[in-house]
Amino acid sequence: MKLGKILVTSAWPYIQHVLHLGNLLPILSADVMARYYRLKGHEVLFVSGSDVHGTPVEVEAVKQGVSPKELTDKNHELVVELFKRWAISFDNYTTTESPVHKEFVMDFHRKVAENGYVFTQESELPYCPNCKRFLPDRFVEGECPYCGYKGARGDQCEQCGRLLDPTKLIDARCSICGASPLFRRTVHWYFDLPRFSDQLREYITNNKQFPDNARNFSLRFIKEGLKPRPMTRDSDWGIPAPFEGAEGKTLYVWFENVLGYVSATIEYFKTHGDPDRWKEYWFDKDSKVLCFIGKDNIPFHTIIFPALLLATHEGYNLPWNVSTNEWLNFEGQKSSKSRKIGIWID
């Protein structure tokens, strides 16, 4: 009997700092599963990479007085060496600065836009008068309007895991200088996520491989009503938004890093002289995609990533399993690279 191919993925860690043990947990779990399926005789590919874009990197680079590229080039090399010391059996550990990744992501989103799932909208967003910049994602902090956590960021609350609108933060402040932001109007490109509500509900409900925490969180998210998600940011660090009129905008990190599971597969087979074979892992219906993540990444892997794949109309395999670990606490607090809490893997 022919055994189906298995693609094992682990969440791409931000590398503004060395990783802590909490970051390593899903990677270790993925490594165990990759080794298991290899022993069972399956063709297995295990991919991941360093997420070098996004505001976590930008904020840390500002604090250190270096460029995001300088910071991430150094940390990527360090992380690769650490994974070798931990004997993680990656087939391809790459980076979101990979030319293959950039090309794939831009072509992918052009397709999504051509299919009618992208629109523009003017929004009021926080702007720091001292730093003279808009404050996307981790450039702005405040109190979570849902759970009251004081250190919530502009895109997500670390404490309760909710995706946030930065305009809803209570007592918002610039994470660089601490100033209270002004709110200025700017145009962004949005993904029409609500159009996938029914398909996502059916997919999540019927997928018996999902652990209860991932299924329950995701179904609650859908029940509360999916909202269009902004795809672009006012930033020059990241992948340029490939939409007409979007000059000077980059893609929000969660609209490009999850696509790295596909681009890393493409990159692996390109470098091994078989450039079309990646399709066997992403389109053959006897192949399975397994994602290993931390619980704060659930909505990006069970909602946004599947919706993006559906939006291409190309028949991508959706994740067969999204395995999630709970947060690893250290001295009573959630491990966090940005807050320098945890046990470091070096």
Residue map of PLM features:
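Generic secondary-structure signature for well-ordered alpha-helical cores
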Residues: 84, 114-117, 162, 179, ...
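Cys/His-rich short segments
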Residues: 116-190
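N-terminal Rossmann-like or analogous alpha/beta NTP/dinucleotide-binding catalytic cores
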Residues: 2-121, 129-133, 145, 209
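Short acidic, glycine/serine/threonine-rich loops at helix termini
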Residues: 57-61, 105, 131, 139, ...
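Alpha-helical scaffold segments in soluble metabolic enzymes
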Residues: 111, 146, 159, 199, ...
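Short glycine-/small-residue-rich flexible loop motifs, especially phosphate/cofactor-binding loops
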Residues: 34, 58, 80, 109-110, ...
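Non-catalytic, surface-exposed connector residues within folded enzymatic/regulatory domains
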Residues: 73, 121-122, 138, 168-171, ...
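Structured secondary-structure scaffolds
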Residues: 1-41, 45-48, 95, 100-103, ...
